[in-house]
Amino acid sequence: MCIRDSNLTAHSYGTVRPPKNKQLSERLGYLYDEISLLLNKYKPNMLAVEDTFYSKNFKSAMSLGQARGAIILASYSANISCIEFSPKKIKKSVVGNGNASKEQVQYMVKNILQLESLPTPLDSSDALAIGLCYLNQNHME
């Protein structure tokens, strides 16, 4: 995201999805490589990620934690600081309600960034919401 003349703009957004048919090390390596390419292309001042959360599904939580590790390592390798926000803090920052649904977050992200359509998939709107949370916490400096 970029701020110019008090206008907030999303230059690009999307998702990085490692191939499901590969071994764990290859999927994490793919994620690391793709994030590294994006960091090199866009040269952000900061990377913000969602903090870990408690889940009843241990396997899902473990997979997300491993993916976060690859992303944080890519940030470190690119010498870019990384900050983490809890899911509740992100939702509260963007929607005003820490228990908001993913669809509510998606709707608010579209409105705040004045996008033509809802950002999809929901993971994209979540990522944009994390960026907005960072900007809100830092008073859009």
Regions found by a protein language model. Name each.
Residues 1:
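Sequence context surrounding c-type heme c attachment/ligation sites in exported
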Residues 4-141:
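Phosphate- and other anionic-substrate recognition elements at nucleic-acid/protein interfaces
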